[in-house]
């Protein structure tokens, strides 16, 4: 599971997910990319599930880059616990996703296979996505 090795603070405030992705919004490493078109949170488990799905589809050919990292801790209180008595303990880690954010990149496979792999991976994610190709500058 992806999570930071160490953080400055154990727990963070909720915050608001607004705006568009200013960084990581282009295909930088691979030839094809999976880009988010809606906003939301992706957990470390979802990132890993999508990665496994893509890896299985492309078999041994090609390379995959994960362009998101879950760096925000989400806390929760146990069931049937009264309110108050402090913030709950960290349950899992998420990556805040904004529209336009590149989630995964891939190279070394045919476009058809890349599309299939990204479609399978997108089914595992809670945000809407689209397939993009690298633009030649």
From Swiss-Prot:
Keywords: Ribonucleoprotein, Ribosomal protein, RNA-binding, rRNA-binding, tRNA-binding. GO terms for cellular component: cytosolic large ribosomal subunit. InterPro entries: Ribosomal_uL16 (IPR047873), Ribosomal_uL16_bact-type (IPR000114), Ribosomal_uL16_CS (IPR020798), Ribosomal_uL16_dom (IPR016180), Ribosomal_uL16_sf (IPR036920). GO terms for biological process: translation. GO terms for molecular function: rRNA binding; structural constituent of ribosome; tRNA binding. Signal peptide: none annotated. It comes from the Bacteria. The keyword Ribonucleoprotein applies. PROSITE patterns: RIBOSOMAL_L16_1, RIBOSOMAL_L16_2. Binds 23S rRNA and is also seen to make contacts with the A and possibly P site tRNAs. HAMAP family: Ribosomal_uL16. Belongs to the universal ribosomal protein uL16 family. Part of the 50S ribosomal subunit. This is Large ribosomal subunit protein uL16. It comes from Marinobacter nauticus (strain ATCC 700491 / DSM 11845 / VT8) (Marinobacter aquaeolei).
């Amino acid at each position: 599971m992806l999570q930071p090795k160490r953080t400055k603070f154990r727990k963070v405030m909720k915050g608001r997910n607004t705006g568009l992705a200013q960084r990581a919004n282009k295909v930088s490493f691979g030839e094809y990319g999976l880009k988010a078109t809606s906003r939301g949170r992706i957990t470390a488990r979802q990132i890993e599930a999508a990665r496994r799905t893509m890896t299985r589809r492309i078999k041994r050919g090609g390379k995959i880059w994960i362009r998101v990292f879950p760096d925000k801790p989400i806390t929760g209180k146990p069931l049937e616990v009264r309110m108050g008595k402090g913030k709950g303990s960290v349950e899992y880690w998420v990556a805040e996703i904004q529209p336009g954010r590149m989630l995964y990149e891939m190279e070394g496979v045919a476009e058809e296979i890349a599309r299939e792999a990204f479609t399978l991976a997108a089914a595992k994610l809670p945000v809407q996505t689209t397939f993009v190709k690298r633009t030649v500058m």
